[in-house]
Regions:
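Bacterial N-terminal signal peptides that target proteins for export
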Residues: 1-11
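Bacterial N-terminal signal peptides
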Residues: 10-20
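N-terminal edge beta-strand
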Residues: 26-54
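Extracellular/periplasmic metallocenter environments
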Residues: 27-33, 78-122
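N-terminal post-signal-peptidase region of extra-cytosolic proteins
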Residues: 37-46, 69-72, 81-85
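Beta-strand cores of secreted/periplasmic/IMS beta-sandwich domains, seen most often
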Residues: 45-63, 83-92, 96
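Short beta-turn/strand-loop junction motif enriched in small, turn-promoting residues
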Residues: 54, 74, 103-105
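A general "mature secreted/periplasmic domain" signal
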Residues: 62-80, 95-97
């Protein structure tokens, strides 16, 4: 019986160590993004993170707009003179775009040009 208990205890310790190491690989990233004339500078248009990373996008703009992170379904209003945070944990892998949304007079919205593409790797 003590041998079985010891084996189960060792298995539990290995599982805890694995979970700790898996969690340790996630990181936190902050990106300051400025929209001017409807565009983000070329060198800031691609963001790469790993799955489970905590991501914070700090948005500033020269004109008010609504922005939407597709795939994560996060929408924020951004306005001149303020920094607006968009936070998420990168659970889903793939390529996700952030686009401005503009209201249509007939209802709904239309999309502007892609501001940023976020690539989430496993």
């Amino acid at each position: 019986m003590p041998r079985m208990w010891c084996s189960r205890f060792s298995l539990a310790l290995c599982l805890i160590a694995f979970l700790e190491l898996a969690g340790a690989s996630a990181a936190e990233f902050t990106f300051a993004l400025r929209v001017e004339n409807g565009h983000v500078p070329e060198n800031m248009r691609l963001i790469r993170v790993k799955q489970n990373d905590a991501v914070r996008l700090e948005w500033s703009t020269d004109r008010p707009m609504t922005i939407h992170l597709h795939g994560y379904d996060i929408e924020k209003q951004i306005a001149p003179g303020a920094v607006t945070e968009m936070r998420f944990t990168a659970h889903a892998t793939g390529r996700f775009t952030v686009e401005p949304h503009f209201p249509k007079s007939s209802g709904g919205h239309e999309h502007g040009d892609v501001l940023v593409t976020i690539e989430v790797y496993p």
